[in-house]
């Protein structure tokens, strides 16, 4: 199915029924909605502090992005690679219990509260969400947090889906207790709703591990990464099967803030 720009006008804070929103290969679509502000029902114990500093998040993102860029990968469709590799970095260098998760994801990204980035399928009732091999997103879950290392590329993801809108390059890592109750509860930029799909995660992980090219690239990221404040090499030498040496340059994509 081709990407859709989902338009809806809500009544009493609810999303009108419409065509389910899907995007092949996990690419996003943007749907517009007007949602009445809601009182937060989250626990007062929710943690507002990030799990890792912005500098560390940015470095993890840059390493993975640079390696994928060097092999001309389809980066907008690489959320699972980002998540698997970032989880391994968090395990190895930060001793965190991190793991990749696939499923449906919804992020409110517009200041006026009128647009949400959607990965997966939204049902006619405006509440039920589903995900599958052709409509999903992936993120990292770690010690009660959700971290999305593709968040700095949300604008590129929208462009690839046919919705060129300006989106700031920002870090996404949130205490899961801060997650909205459902899609309709998204009220301000940075609000999110995630629906994990364990079966899909297992399938994607099995497929990932079966592809040596992917596991080699992921391992390359782990070998290149240096945890701050250690100095990070600006490039990495690679020797091909024919003995030719090429160099991967570290992309200097800057993250401007946080969701």
Region spans (language model):
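A structural boundary/capping signal
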Residues: 9, 13, 28-259
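Intrinsically disordered, low-complexity segments enriched in serine/proline and basic residues
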Residues: 19-20, 28
């Amino acid at each position: 199915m081709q990407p859709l720009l989902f338009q809806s006008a809500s009544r009493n804070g609810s999303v009108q029924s419409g065509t389910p929103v899907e995007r092949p290969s996990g690419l996003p679509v943007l749907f517009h909605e007007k949602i009445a502000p809601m009182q937060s029902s989250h626990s007062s114990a929710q943690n507002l502090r990030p799990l890792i500093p912005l500098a560390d998040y940015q470095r993890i993102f840059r390493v993975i992005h640079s390696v994928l860029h060097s092999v001309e990968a389809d980066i907008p469709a690489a959320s699972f690679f980002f998540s698997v590799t970032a989880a391994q970095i968090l395990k190895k260098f930060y001793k965190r219990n991190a793991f990749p998760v696939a499923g449906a994801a919804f992020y409110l990204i517009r200041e006026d509260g009128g647009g949400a980035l959607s990965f997966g399928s939204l049902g006619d009732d405006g509440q039920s969400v589903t995900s599958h091999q052709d409509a999903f997103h992936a993120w990292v879950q770690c010690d009660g947090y959700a971290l999305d290392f593709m968040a700095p590329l949300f604008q590129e993801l929208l462009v690839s889906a046919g919705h060129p809108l300006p989106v700031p390059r920002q870090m996404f890592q949130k205490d899961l207790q801060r997650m909205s109750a459902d899609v309709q509860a998204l009220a301000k930029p940075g609000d999110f709703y995630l629906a994990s799909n364990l079966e899909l995660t297992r399938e994607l992980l099995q497929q990932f591990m079966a592809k040596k090219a992917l596991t080699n690239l992921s391992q390359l990221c782990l070998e290149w990464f240096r945890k701050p404040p250690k100095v990070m090499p600006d490039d990495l030498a690679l020797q091909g099967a024919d003995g030719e040496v090429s160099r991967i340059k570290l992309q200097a994509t800057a993250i401007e803030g946080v969701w």
